[in-house]
A protein has these predicted regions:
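Phosphate-handling active-site elements
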Residues: 171-172, 197-211
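Conserved N-terminal subdomain of the carbohydrate kinase-like
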Residues: 1-60, 236-246
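Conserved phosphate/ATP/ADP-binding segment of small-molecule kinases
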Residues: 61-171
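Charged C-terminal helix
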Residues: 205-247
Length: 247
């Protein structure tokens, strides 16, 4: 990777966008930080998906050293897409994350959403972000704590999946009905669609709504196909729809 970066630097390479996701260790994170230092320009869109854990637990790759580097990456980004576990890890570290995550699970409906909004606002402010998008929030109540982009909530008490967006001080939610179980790779797809839209200078609201609709279709297809959760989701069928979208 270093030789490739050296060659790109000679050629004056300047990407429109940089998107980082899963990093296995501190060494990989250091390489990405070096990449950002060398190639990020004033107008480069930087999106970081700080993959470190889920469902209130850190992944096996997690170390305090990796967290420190994720913090550096997040400080270099305009937009981040953590799940709730990762948002708490960025703010508080592993031990405090576990306590706070457990506390959030004890809250119902609206109260839980309100606390997550505060977490999103704190994250955006502390890291000086254009937007913090906290993904994969399960929700069952009918009312919402902030304006929602997608109002597919006609069926009372049906399970919804929500994504919180805190953008330049504004707070809103994007909900869609939950279909099936938990599938590998959905966070990667969400962040990929989001980053591509932002590079095309679409609004954050448009990008998030687009990513949620795309994932909803892909997950529904996956459930119908009976695909194992570890094999990811059947998204290929819907790529054409993304290609047809204009700015």
């Amino acid at each position: 990777m270093e030789q490739i970066m050296d060659e790109w630097e000679k050629r004056g390479f300047s990407p429109d966008g940089i998107y980082t996701g899963f990093l296995a260790d501190e060494e990989q994170a250091d390489k990405i930080l070096d990449f950002l230092r060398r190639f990020r320009k004033e107008k480069t869109v930087v999106l970081v998906d700080p993959v470190m854990g889920d469902n209130g637990g850190a992944y096996g790759i997690y170390t305090e050293g990796l967290r420190e580097r994720m913090v550096q990456l997040v400080r270099s980004a305009q937009v981040i897409t953590p799940n709730l576990t990762e948002a708490l890890l960025l703010l508080y570290g592993k031990e405090e994350m576990e306590k706070r995550y457990t506390g959030l699970l004890e809250l119902d409906g609206e109260k839980r959403l309100e606390q997550i909004e505060k977490i999103g606002e704190k994250l955006a402010n502390e890291y000086c972000l254009q937007a913090a998008v906290i993904t994969g929030i399960e929700y069952v109540k009918e009312q919402k704590a902030a304006p929602a982009l997608i109002s597919d909530r006609n069926e009372k008490n049906s399970m919804q999946m929500g994504n919180l967006v805190v953008e330049n001080g504004q707070v809103y939610w994007c909900f869609a009905p939950k279909t099936g179980g938990s599938y590998s790779g959905t966070g990667d797809l969400f962040a990929s669609v989001l980053s591509a839209g932002l590079v095309k200078r679409m609004s954050m609201m448009t990008c998030v709504e687009l990513a949620v609709k795309f994932l909803s279709k892909a997950i529904a297809e996956t459930v119908q196909e009976g695909t194992d959760r570890n094999d990811g989701v059947c998204f290929e069928k819907y790529l054409e729809e993304l290609c047809k979208i204009e700015k």
